[in-house]
UniProtKB/Swiss-Prot annotation:
Tissue: Expressed by the skin glands.
The keyword Transferase belongs to this UniProt entry's keyword annotation: no
Organism: Ascaphus truei (Coastal tailed frog)
Lineage of origin: Eukaryota, Metazoa, Chordata, Craniata, Vertebrata
Subcellular location: Secreted
GO BP terms in the entry: defense response
Keywords attached to this entry: Amphibian defense peptide, Secreted
Chain's role: Putative defense peptide.
Hydrolase found in the keyword field: no
First-listed, main subcellular location of the protein, grouped into a coarse class: secreted
This protein's name: Tryptophyllin-3
Sequence similarity: Belongs to the frog skin active peptide (FSAP) family. Tryptophillin subfamily.
A GO cellular component entry from the record: extracellular region
């Protein structure tokens, strides 16, 4: 999910 990509 997006929080893993930041």
């Amino acid at each position: 999910d997006p929080w893993d990509w930041v």
